[in-house]
Amino acid sequence: MPKRELWPAGLCSEPVTHIGSCGDMMSTTSTRSGSSDSSYDFLSAEEKECLLFLEKTIGSLEAEADSGLSTDESEPATSPRSFRALPTATQQAPQGKPEATDIQQVPVPKRVAQPSCPPESHSLGLRAGSYSLPRNLHLGRSQNLRESATQANSPVSEASEVFLEEPEKGQTSQGAKAKTIQPPAPSQKGTLDLSTVLIPPPEAFQDIRPKESGEESPPKKPGEQTHTPQVHSLERSPHSQKKVEMSSETVSHKATEKGWTEGLQQPQQPPAQSSQPTKAEELSLPSGVKPSIQQTPLTASKARKLPPNIVLKSSRSSFHSHPQNWLSNHTEATDSGPVSSLQEQRKARREALEKLGLPQDQDDPSLLVNKHTSTLKVREAQPQTPSQARAPARPASPALVSGTASAAGKVSPKKAVAPMDSLSKGWIPTQETPPGKVAEAKSMPIPIPKTLKENSSRTQPKPDPRLTLQESSIPGLRQMNFKSNTLERSGVGLSSYLSAAEKKDPSCQTSTSLGKSPFLDKVSPSAFRNSRPRPASLGMGKDFAGIQGGKLVGLEQDQCSQQPSFKGQSYDKLPRPPCISVKISPKGIPDGHRREALKKLGLLKE
């Protein structure tokens, strides 16, 4: 009798609708409609067992929900269903009834332990118990519901809707894990409650719940389909309404009756949702599940926002220009922006850097009285060299340093570059590149005008006025302009010597200014680390000043003999020696190494 009792009970319930053939489904509906009292009595006895197992399984599910096992088990059960529903549909349709007996006997004592079913299913020739159950589920769903959709929906959905209140407290926790087993208990408890409460209250529930199902079913049909990717268009046209109603009741009972079931379903549903489209489910699921699922992509998006910030930090095309990240970022973004505000910002920054003694040479070219001319022509030189594109904003920006005599001394070597650009266009590419490479002027403030002057003096008397103009620009002092007209070559040494001496003076000034501004001292170590070539370039200027004392004239004369051949190469090599000097400078290499480098460049011969 228990098997027969299980038959009508389970047939009325969904698992047999899943498992049995259409004949089973018809018998289930007929048994429910016809002999409702007797079936309710049998089901009441079974439900007692079911309730015991539900309590046990709920405890186990809570433990598993904490450990996350229940969610893991529910997903594989759903995934194989989608893959194996069709092949087993053909195989297991004739076996529906004998399987239904075995499977329904199992779920009553064993709801959570679906894997315990495989021995019985293997006896029938099935593959895996957990997989065979969902296979049978799809058979019953696709076939029985199509044929007896109206009958099954009316009684089964009524009983399931009415009585899912109690059993789904435990079964909702089981969720997708025991979808096959969820309906039998609701139908069985439905029988208990119907036996006690009689039929009219379920009818009232029918009137209320079909509305809810009509409302909630459309969002949850896709949601459940996402939980178990299966042939839902075929299977769950009527059946989706049942489980939608069940799930809707579960949601309502979750919020109203028992909140702990929410804790059970939440761990189960988020994995299924994460693996599957969550839109419809998020609509139907309780609010507790939505934020947990939606917040994870939001956090991921926040993490995505971080890498662009890192990219902005890492975007250091102007890194060697200003090794400091904030300087580089502002220079890049501000090149496109208005130059005036950028110039003001850079002026303040460069004043601090000048106090540190790091990028003073960079600040100097803008200090020129020819700021506008230098900026315009450096902009012209921008297409020539990308490093030059960084220079134009800089020369225009810091006019503040011009007030300092040390800055004026430093301006002298680089002013030669800017007026040279304006006066002698033949030298523009050669000399515009050094302003682009600000460190070059520091490292080689003297040799650049040397080469130009030697080339001019070497080749023709025409470059002599250029030399005078260059020298006038080189000292950066209008007094030196007069001297340069007379001294020409020696003026190079004098101007460079004065600039080097004045560089020594600003170094003292930088120390005093550093004492004045201790916060710059804090900034200084990082600036030195990032821009080691520049402090070394200052050292190179000092070292080169030692050469200037009595060696520049001889070196210039040697270069004068060399440079006719280097006229064409001056474009290439004038940018190169400062680059090499910058590389040599951070090491603080003595003059001998510098001379060797100059010899390799062909600028010096001893």
Swiss-Prot record:
Residues 206-224, 233-260, 344-354, 451-465 have a biased composition (Basic and acidic residues). Keywords: Cytoplasm, Phosphoprotein, Receptor. Residues 265-277, 381-399 have a biased composition (Low complexity). Residues 64-488, 500-543, 555-574 are annotated as: Disordered. The modification Phosphoserine is found at S130, S132, S397, S412, S524. GO terms for cellular component: cytosol; plasma membrane. It holds the Pfam family SARG. It is found in: Cytoplasm. It comes from the Eukaryota. Its main location: cytoplasm. InterPro entries: SARG. The keyword Aminoacyl-tRNA synthetase does not apply. The keyword Cytoplasm applies. Residues 68-81, 141-157, 312-331, 558-568 have a biased composition (Polar residues). The modification Phosphothreonine is found at T334. Belongs to the SARG family. Putative androgen-specific receptor. This is Specifically androgen-regulated gene protein. The gene is Sarg.
